[in-house]
């Protein structure tokens, strides 16, 4: 059984998600202690518990410690990953519901299902656009298109928007199985082609997305970027607002967002998203700090070496690399001076 220290590095949910994915793929039993020890509320929260149960369901795993707040988990796969039709609902993991991020559940099960025999259809319910996690827009416009270049064939369709704190969102994920993963080279991002944006609200007046869109377009044009922001006004279980920007370079993609909240003007929300995008743009890097650690797992499972240049070597990245190396599947080198990550499979 592989013993994993959940408190290692930044001690967050990434250790758990990576471990679950690799346990499902390899069939290796794992024990994780100190889960999310670095967080204010340690242990499994609703989205982590949903990820545990989703990963367990697809490989018929025996679970010990799968409860809210649990800091110790044993996960013993019972079979190879089974493709199929699944539904996972983050809001059912705790009483009173949850807006836990469904993108994090998606990222836990995507690669196991892509490598399985047969196609899968997964309905995920919970938070689609929430802080401190990838949004479904980021998954759709950045993460999946980059993974597609590595051989992953998957599509996500947004059925309903779910914001913090109510959630109530829903997506459908289609995954083609039997993937052979190839490496990726993202050392040069090339010229910026355009910035695409979505300014979206649910249960709020139409002037709010319009103001977010106008402010973002003005700011990015002042910085001499080509930009177009679409406005969306949708139905939802509760009011919510956000703007999500995707920058398309010749060879790479990145995305940033801003979320509305009480006493924060629509213009300020747009400024938050634009500031993040411009900060990344001026680094000249090919890969944003979030994608940097999300790419480690597919690169580990690929037949060729991968290399990519990151905007920042984050603790998340270093932590994730250390977890992956415990499974003995890949050698990961992080050149902190040049900010270049190299991943070479030890099994192919």
UniProtKB/Swiss-Prot annotation:
Its main location: cytoplasm. ATP binds at residues 107, 290-294. GO terms for biological process: RNA processing. It is found in: Cytoplasm. SUPFAM superfamilies: EPT/RTPC-like (SSF55205), RNA 3'-terminal phosphate cyclase, RPTC, insert domain (SSF52913). HAMAP family: RTC. Keywords: ATP-binding, Cytoplasm, Ligase, Nucleotide-binding. The active site is at 316 (tele-amp-histidine intermediate). This is RNA 3'-terminal phosphate cyclase. Its EC number is 6.5.1.4. Belongs to the RNA 3'-terminal cyclase family. Type 1 subfamily. Pfam families: RTC, RTC_insert. It catalyses: a 3'-end 3'-phospho-ribonucleotide-RNA + ATP = a 3'-end 2',3'-cyclophospho-ribonucleotide-RNA + AMP + diphosphate. GO terms for cellular component: cytoplasm. GO terms for molecular function: ATP binding; RNA-3'-phosphate cyclase activity. Catalyzes the conversion of 3'-phosphate to a 2',3'-cyclic phosphodiester at the end of RNA. The mechanism of action of the enzyme occurs in 3 steps: (A) adenylation of the enzyme by ATP; (B) transfer of adenylate to an RNA-N3'P to produce RNA-N3'PP5'A; (C) and attack of the adjacent 2'-hydroxyl on the 3'-phosphorus in the diester linkage to produce the cyclic end product. The biological role of this enzyme is unknown but it is likely to function in some aspects of cellular RNA processing.
